[in-house]
From Swiss-Prot:
Transmembrane segments: none annotated. Belongs to the DarP family. The gene is darP. It holds the Pfam family DarP. GO terms for cellular component: cytosol. This is Dual-action ribosomal maturation protein DarP.
Length: 174
């Protein structure tokens, strides 16, 4: 009688639970793709049916209809190069995160300038030497006056806009 050798290293079948986890991960990725803007979807290596399904997703408002559509997107995701899609999404998330960090840093500069006086202005000019100190001082004084009189922060917005323009010039974006 022939002996039967069970060699597990040759065949590694996925359990039903593992398959379900992978399919749910594809659905989650598909749901994440539905939140992207259409111009970003154009950059992704997607098949036409999937691209169409992703663009139709916002039309489904009812909970069950949306859930069913996400499941359909998950089914279409099985035929995709998921690694390339994830890499591009990570790149977009990273650039968005960097933009938000820079935006918050500029907001902190604005708040320090309005609250801090000459010491904050000197520190800012040290960071941005191409700054028109007199113009910035006028904007800051106007913003301080508005804050003291509980007026809308129009001058604070102008301070932020000027700071952002200086930052973009410094980083070569202008």
């Amino acid at each position: 009688m022939a002996e039967f050798h069970d060699d597990d290293s040759q065949f590694e079948e996925k359990s039903k639970s593992q398959i379900k986890r992978e399919l749910h991960a594809l659905q989650d990725l598909g749901e994440r793709l539905t939140t992207l803007q259409p111009q970003l979807l154009e950059r992704l290596p997607l098949t036409d049916p999937l691209r169409k399904a992703l663009l139709e997703a916002p039309k489904h408002k009812a909970h069950i209809a949306r859930k069913r559509h996400i499941q359909y997107i998950g089914k279409l995701m099985r035929d995709q190069d998921v690694d390339a899609i994830v890499a591009l999404i990570d790149q977009v998330d990273s650039s968005t995160r960097q933009y938000n960090e820079r935006f918050h840093a500029l907001e902190r500069w604005r708040d320090q300038l309005i609250a801090g006086g000459d010491a904050a202005l000197d520190a800012f000019v040290g960071e941005f030497p191409e700054c028109d100190r007199q113009h910035l001082r006028g904007l800051v004084r106007h913003a301080q006056h508005e804050a003291a009189h509980n007026k809308p922060p129009a001058a604070a917005r102008k301070v932020f806009k000027y700071i952002r323009e200086l930052d973009e010039t410094k980083r070569g974006l202008r």
